[in-house]
Regions:
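Conserved SAM/SAH cofactor-binding pocket of Class I
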Residues: 32-117, 121-127, 133-141
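Hydrophobic/basic alpha-helical segments enriched in Actinobacteria
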Residues: 23, 122, 136, 205-206, ...
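Class I SAM-dependent transferase core
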Residues: 1-38
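SAM/dcSAM-binding transferase cores
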Residues: 209-265
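Conserved Class I SAM-dependent methyltransferase catalytic core
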Residues: 153-210
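Residue-level signal for inorganic ion chemistry
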Residues: 30, 128, 159, 217
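General small-molecule cofactor/ligand-binding pocket signal
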Residues: 15, 94-96, 197-200
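Mobile active-site "lid"/loop adjacent to the S-adenosyl-L-methionine
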Residues: 129-158
């Protein structure tokens, strides 16, 4: 199964399956929003970390944080192990092979929080759930790609439920979801005891509909009842199809050449 060797940040590279699931703009925007949400984070967990893209991007920008990635899919977990090790981060970034839905209570919850040195709760969480409910699309015959696209182990509601159980006082959770169904994120957040603070809508080209939204949330108990969710938009290409200044700034944030050699979208 051939792998490609790709730049992730100015200092980190990742191996990805050439014909498997690959990191894309939703991962980059989620990592960017997570870094902005709590730049001083010390205890960070990425749920459903896949091959380690968001996990490593955030760790790169927040070099003082202890981090943990959780991944259930075997092929992705193996790649995450290799990618963490190849970038010299195995001492700072731990990995857990398992289903994120099992981390909401008991010894499993205690173990993941202990792994980042935060028994009372992590201060930063991220996740990039699949967007397609079971039955709404035909899963890829490739298991890695199928789990990345179809909610075979749950959707945004499940990610939010686990985030609510792991987030510490004053912490922030960042998760992306289908822009066509914002009500799912809102309902999942409420059920998990979380309140949306910011929603970034990702638009592929000026004039097009948003493809996905990246939500930043805090614990409802920590926030005033009148808290209002701020909204913003990220446009990747202008009306002429050219990369926008926002897109170039996103690459520069991770110390990459703002003129990409090829698209990651």
């Amino acid at each position: 199964d051939p792998l490609t060797d790709d730049a992730l940040t100015g200092g980190y590279r990742v191996w990805q399956r050439k014909r498997g699931h690959r990191y894309s703009i939703d991962d980059v925007l989620t990592a960017h929003e997570a870094c902005l949400a709590l730049p001083g984070a010390s205890h960070y967990i990425d749920l459903g970390c896949g091959l380690g893209s968001v996990l490593l991007m955030v760790a790169y920008k927040l070099p003082a944080t202890r981090a943990l990635g959780v991944e259930a899919q075997e092929v992705s977990y193996a790649l995450a192990e290799r990618n963490v090790a190849r970038n010299g981060q195995a001492q700072r970034i731990a990995l857990r092979h398992g289903d994120l839905r099992g981390l909401r209570a008991g010894s499993a919850r205690d173990e993941v929080l202990a792994a980042v040195g935060a028994p009372g709760g992590a201060d930063l969480l991220s996740g990039t759930p699949p967007y397609m409910p079971v039955g709404t699309s035909t899963p890829s015959p490739d298991a890695q790609r199928a789990h990345a696209r179809v909610e075979l182990r749950g959707g945004i509601e499940d990610y939010l439920a686990t985030m609510g159980a792991l987030l510490g006082v004053g912490g922030r959770a960042v998760v992306c979801g289908d822009a066509r169904t914002p009500e799912r994120a809102a309902a999942g957040a409420a059920a998990a005891g979380l309140t949306p603070l910011r929603r970034l809508d990702a638009i592929p080209r000026e004039g097009a509909q948003a493809l996905f939204s990246v939500w930043t949330l805090g614990r409802t108990l920590d926030l005033p009842p009148e808290t209002v969710c701020a909204t913003d938009r990220f446009v990747a290409r202008d009306a002429d199809g050219q990369r926008t200044s926002a897109y170039r700034a996103l690459r520069s944030f991770f110390d990459l050449d703002p003129r990409p050699p090829h698209d990651i979208t």
